[in-house]
Amino acid sequence: MKYVYTGLAALLTIALIVVLNIQLPVGNSKTPRLGYFLSPQQGFWQNAESDNTDFGGEIVLSGLKGKADVYFDNRLVPHIYADNDADAYFLQGYLHAKFRLFQMEFETNVAGGRLSELIGKDGLAIDKYFRRLGMVYAAENSLKVMEADPVVKSAMDAYTAGVNAYIAHLKPNQIPLEFKLLNATPEPWTNLRSALFLKFMSYDLTGQGDDDLLMTNTKNLLGYNMFQKLFPDRADSLDPILPIGTTFEKPSIVPKIPVNVDSVYYGISGGTSTAIPPVMPNKNNGSNNWAVSGSKTKSGRPILCNDPHLGLNLPSLWYEVQISTPTQNTYGATFPGAPCVIIGFN
C-alpha cells in the first residue's frame, strides 16, 4: 500500500508542477504562469500595500547632480525641492515611474501601435490603425523640434533618466501588478516615448476622430457641389474672422496629396482593400479657459481658470506635484509620461 501512496504523491507533485507552469488562454492572450503569479516571493502578494507606508528615508540616485528632497503631504502629493531644474525633472520622472509606470507604458504602446505586444491579438486592429495614422512618424518629427531647444532637451533627458533610474532599481518581485498579469516587464523609457504620449494626447483632444477621412469619402461620393451644400465651410449667419479680400505676403501651405489617397485609410495590398476600424476619440474632449474680472470677484483680483474637458480615468490622467528650484516654483497637474507642470500656477 505504501507504494500506492508514494506513487500517488509523485503523480500529484508532477501534476502540481505542470499546472503551476502552464498559461491559461484568456481571449487571444494568456495568463502568466500560475506558479510565478502565486509565488509569495515574486507574485502578486508582493504588490500588497500597507496602510502605514513610510515615505521617509534617504535614497542614493546616481543621476542627480546635487542634493534634492521630496516631501509627501497628507494627501501623498509630492513636493520636489532641488538645486537645479534637471534634478527636479529627474525626480519627477522617478516619481511618475514609481506610481504610474504601467499607465505610462500602456498609453505609449497604444500610441506606437504596439498594444498587441501586451494583450495579444485583441490589440492588433488598434495597432494597425495607429501605425497607419503615422503616430510614431509624427512623434519622431516633434521630438526633433523639441530636442533642438537645449532647455527642452535637458528637461526631457533628465526626466527620461529619472524614469529609467526607477526601472533599474526594480527587483522582479517589485514589478507592478499589471505587468505580472500580462507576463510582461517594463521597457526602458526614451524621449520618443514622451513625444509619443504628447502626440497621443493631441490626438485624443482633437475630438474629430476620422472626420477628415469620412468627409473626403463623402465628397468623392456626392461630388463637390452637393458636398458644399450639405457641409458648407461656414454658416451664412457667421462672419469670418478674417475679412473677405484679405491678402497675405506668403502663400498658405498646400500639403502634398498621396499618389493614392485611399491608402491613408485603407490597407492596400495585392489589389485588395481592407478597411481599418477607426479608433474614435471622444468628441466631448477638448479644453477651454475662462476669466473673471477683478471687478466681479470678492478679492478684487482677476481669476483665470483652465478648464480641460477630459473624462475621469483610473488611474487619473493627471499627477499632482510641486516643483521648486532656484528658477521656478510651480504647483499643479502633470502628465505621467512627460516633464513639467501642464496645468498649474507659480
Mark where each language-model region is.
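Substrate-recognition/specificity elements adjacent to catalytic centers across diverse enzyme folds
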Residues: 2-303, 308-315, 327-328, 332-334, ...
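Core nucleotidyl-transferase/polymerase catalytic module
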Residues: 324
